[in-house]
Each structure stands twice: as C-alpha cells, then as structure tokens.
A protein has these predicted regions:
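A structural signal for short secondary-structure junctions
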Residues: 39-42, 66, 87-91
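Peripheral, non-catalytic segments that deliver or gate enzyme domains
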Residues: 3, 50-58, 88-98
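Short secondary-structure transition/capping segments
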Residues: 17-32, 71-91, 121
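Solvent-exposed, flexible loop/coil residues
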Residues: 11-15, 61-64, 104
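Active-site "cap" helix and flanking loop/linker of ATP-utilizing ligase/carboxylase catalytic domains
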Residues: 1-55
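Generic C-terminus detector
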Residues: 77-121
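Glycine-rich active-site loop/lid that clamps phosphate-bearing ligands
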Residues: 49-81
Length: 121
C-alpha cells in the first residue's frame, strides 16, 4: 500500500524506484519493474506542514539558505484559504520533501523548525 504521510513517495524519490507502481502491479498480478538495492543520495526528510492556529493562510516562508534542500513543496492550500490549528493528520496543509548532504544537517533542521513558518492571519 502507499502508506501514510507519503512515505512510499519519499522512498521512491530517494531510491529512484517507483515503489507505489510496483505495489499496485503486484496486487493485480502484473509483473513488477526491476528492483535493486537502493543507493541513497543524501539524507532525505519529510516535513508535514500545519498551522499553529486557526486563521487565513498567507504563505509558507522558508529560510533562503535552506531553499536548495527542498526537493518538493506540496501545499494543499493557497493564500486566502481558511486553515485550522493542527490537531490531527486531517489538519495538515502540505508537505516538504528535503535532501541534506549530511545526517547532522538533517537532524539539526528537523530538531529546530525555526527555519520555516506558516504565515496565518
């Protein structure tokens, strides 16, 4: 199955193998694409984005020095949309998939989220 929080998609990006397509093919009895042991390029991370309060979404702001680490930005809201304070997965407003060159950088930025903000009025 695809899994929650887009885990299969992130692994597909990191390993350059379409795990979701292969899972569907296997489920319906079709031959799957060749799979190999992955060689990961960097240290991959996914951020689940949410608002800290109810309001109107304005923007997602990311520190300029980290923009190059963002592989995929997937916002499910647009400026002007109403958002609710995060209380569960159904309140998420998007995801960021990131790739860092070192494990230390990945862990550093996951432990401190001050490098991005969800602007809400």
């Amino acid at each position: 199955r695809g899994g929650g929080n887009r885990l299969s998609e992130v692994l597909s990006m990191a390993a350059e193998t379409n795990l979701v397509a292969n899972a569907v093919k296997a489920a319906v009895g079709l031959p799957v694409d060749e799979m190999r042991d992955p060689v990961y390029n960097g240290h991959w991370t996914e951020i689940i984005l949410h608002s800290g309060r109810d309001g109107i979404f304005r923007a997602l702001d990311i520190a300029p020095e980290l923009e190059s680490a963002v592989v995929q930005r997937d916002l499910w809201v647009k400026p002007g949309d109403a958002v609710e304070r995060f209380s569960g997965a159904n309140k998420a407003i998007g995801t960021l998939v990131m790739n860092f060159s070192t494990r230390e950088d990945s862990e550093k930025y996951m432990a401190d989220d001050s490098w991005y903000s969800v602007a809400v009025d």
